[in-house]
Amino acid sequence: MNVTLTKAELADLLFERVGLNKREAKDMVEGFFEEIRTALERGDSVKLSGFGNFQLRDKPQRPGRNPKTGEEIPITARRVVTFHASQKLKAAVEQLSDASKQP
């Protein structure tokens, strides 16, 4: 059962569970992700205790290949965002995975 949780659904959960009105819930979710984006744009890491870390990583230029022609082409250097799940999150996901495998 793969379901995707969206920002709109997060806002609905805040509305239902916390008691914010729908506008406040939507603004809170948007603001949360905006703060993460802004921090990453500044080059800062984002550490969410019990969840994980978002970090920037510079990837150097490397050789690549056009799969159609086989021609070698350079893949330019770039900066990417990486996410590393916390041990707590990994353990929770693993526990769910183990439970779903039980008959």
Swiss-Prot record:
Q: Name one GO biological process term.
A: DNA recombination
List, in alphabetical order, the Gene Ontology terms for molecular function in this entry. Answer: DNA binding; structural constituent of chromatin
Question: What GO CC terms are in its UniProt record?
Answer: cytosol
Start and end residues of each stretch annotated as Disordered: 51-73
Q: Which InterPro entries match?
A: Hist_DNA-bd, Histone-like_DNA-bd_CS, IHF-like_DNA-bd_dom_sf, IHF_alpha
Q: What intrachain disulfides are recorded? A: none
One Pfam family matching this protein: Bac_DNA_binding
> What are the record keywords, sorted?
DNA recombination, DNA-binding, Transcription, Transcription regulation, Translation regulation
Xref: SUPFAM superfamilies = IHF-like DNA-binding proteins
Spell out the family assignment given in the record's similarity comment.
Answer: Belongs to the bacterial histone-like protein family.
Oligomeric and partner information: Heterodimer of an alpha and a beta chain.
User: What is the stated purpose of this protein?
Assistant: This protein is one of the two subunits of integration host factor, a specific DNA-binding protein that functions in genetic recombination as well as in transcriptional and translational control.
**Protein name (Swiss-Prot/TrEMBL):** Integration host factor subunit alpha
What phylogenetic lineage does the species belong to? Answer: Bacteria, Pseudomonadati, Pseudomonadota, Betaproteobacteria, Rhodocyclales
